[in-house]
Amino acid sequence: MLKIGSHVSMSGKKMLLAASEEAVSYGANTFMIYTGAPQNTRRKAIEELNIEAGHEHMKAHGIEDIVVHAPYIINIGNTKNPDTFALGVNFLRAEIERTEAIGAKQLVLHPGAHVGAGAEAGLRQIIRGLNEVLTREQTVEIALETMAGKGSECGRTFEELAYIIDGVAYNDKLSVCFDTCHTHDAGYDIVNDFDGVLSEFDRVIGLERLKVLHINDSKNPRGSRKDRHENIGFGHIGFRALNYIVHHPQLADIPKILETPYVGEDKNNKKPPYKHEIAMLRAQTFDDQLLEKIVADTQ
């Protein structure tokens, strides 16, 4: 069964219930949340996340497999500022607790950035951080995301992710989130040779570690190292390639999460594209009028 959804918001008093309601309104059967704003580390207590009501709504609508994303501000690759590293380690420990309480199995993490110290130093620091965070007892896996290589980001290549995994003691608690935009922007040819890329991933990392897919088109050509998401079928990856990935038989059980941009000229009234993009991917037919339909949607 196709597991497809999007990033949704966990906010207000409804929290997890609000996230599930939003996902269902898009025709989704999975979703991804941040436990608070992605730009900061302010978080509500677990008791305020409205988990029980959220679970009831999810169960009623056939949603079992959800994903949590750690905030962007976390950087355990930073060797230059001990406070930034310590904040990342401490926050990740607490985020694992929240993720377990919510009932998600995967916590997606941007591995980190070396901020000028060099890739090797950054990778070693990420390993150090994960070794401080991960425990034998935890049930949540940290899903290291494939990165575009923008700035000093670590995790642009499968080899870098494998290096991190190999250096971590409890690496059975590590998985990978494959982002189509990032992988394309990093230089992998997922448009013309996705099966070749998948084989390379399997050889370097192991396909059994692939637990989350971020499905995004890209505003930039392959290898640009930019990381700018585009709506499905309207970027440099294109609908054919993304549809092939979404329906790939080897990836059937993996949650596919859309993180595509809201649509509209009015910055204060942009519309979420997810209901339309999910329907289009389910139908496996590209709609070149999609953006106009999203803007016209009054729901």
Swiss-Prot record:
Comment on bound cofactor: Binds 3 Zn(2+) ions.
Positions annotated to bind Zn(2+) 2: E145, D179, H214, E259
Domain of life: Bacteria
Enzyme type, top EC level: hydrolase
Pfam name, any one: AP_endonuc_2
Cofactor or coenzyme needed: Zn(2+)
Keyword annotations of the record: DNA damage, DNA repair, Endonuclease, Hydrolase, Metal-binding, Nuclease, Zinc
Catalytic activity: Endonucleolytic cleavage to 5'-phosphooligonucleotide end-products
GO biological process, one term: base-excision repair
Catalytic activity, EC: 3.1.21.2
GO terms for MF: deoxyribonuclease IV (phage-T4-induced) activity; DNA binding; DNA-(apurinic or apyrimidinic site) endonuclease activity; phosphoric diester hydrolase activity; zinc ion binding
Xref: SMART domains: AP2Ec
PROSITE patterns: AP_NUCLEASE_F2_1, AP_NUCLEASE_F2_2, AP_NUCLEASE_F2_3, AP_NUCLEASE_F2_4
Binding sites annotated in the UniProt record for Zn(2+) 3: H182, D227, H229
Amino-acid positions noted as binding Zn(2+) 1 in the UniProt annotation, renumbered to this chain: H69, H110, E145
Role this protein plays: Endonuclease IV plays a role in DNA repair. It cleaves phosphodiester bonds at apurinic or apyrimidinic (AP) sites, generating a 3'-hydroxyl group and a 5'-terminal sugar phosphate.
Family the UniProt entry places it in: Belongs to the AP endonuclease 2 family.
Protein name: Probable endonuclease 4
